[in-house]
Amino acid sequence: MKLLSKIMIIALAASMLQACNGQSGMNKQGTGTLLGGAGGALLGSQFGQGKGQLVGVGVGALLGAVLGGQIGASMDEQDRRLLELTSQRALESAPSGSNIEWRNPDNGNHGYVTPNKTYRNSAGQYCREYTQTVIIGGKQQKTYGNACRQPDGQWQVVN
């Protein structure tokens, strides 16, 4: 549980740093930075134990934030809409391990969502682990996360 608290602190710090950019609302680069940092922290937490695990969380958060910010800055509104629609479809009905693809015909950006393990959280909601892979300008980037199904049927990212 302590590790989860540390990850939440990192995510909160990232969101406060984003708030300092002076814009009302979060821009696409800020959103990418925040989500990339949280995903990187989660991935980094899988390595090591004790202080080594904390270092993994910090390094993962930093690298995830940098990569997420780059992805967010490069994705346009259509890319984000296609990714969101594909994510909802993949999480709702795709078998674990399958790649559900999207492509923006206007700019060539594309990617896929891979849903993985399905589980129930402590509140009884169905949740899934997933990987999002995007190819922007020929460069591939991956993010990892978890999403839970809401009462209205939509899937919401929980980390």
From Swiss-Prot:
**Topology class, membrane:** Lipid-anchor
Q: Which domain of life is it from?
A: Bacteria
Q: Which InterPro entries match?
A: Anti_2, Gly_zipper_2TM_dom, Surface_antigen_Rickettsia
Give the UniProt keywords, A-Z: Cell outer membrane, Lipoprotein, Membrane, Palmitate, Signal
Task: Report the locations given in the UniProt record.
Answer: Cell outer membrane
- For the lipid attachment S-diacylglycerol cysteine, which residues are annotated? 20
- Per the annotation, which location comes first and is thus the protein's main one? membrane
Q: Which residues form the signal peptide?
A: 1-19
Under Pfam families, the record lists: 17kDa_Anti_2 (PF16998), Rick_17kDa_Anti (PF05433)
**Can you name a GO cellular component term?**
cell outer membrane
Q: Which PROSITE patterns match?
A: PROKAR_LIPOPROTEIN (PS51257)
Q: Where is the lipid attached (N-palmitoyl cysteine)?
A: 20
As for family, the record states: Belongs to the rickettsiale 17 kDa surface antigen family.
The protein's name in its UniProt record: 17 kDa surface antigen
- From which source organism is this entry? Rickettsia prowazekii (strain Madrid E)
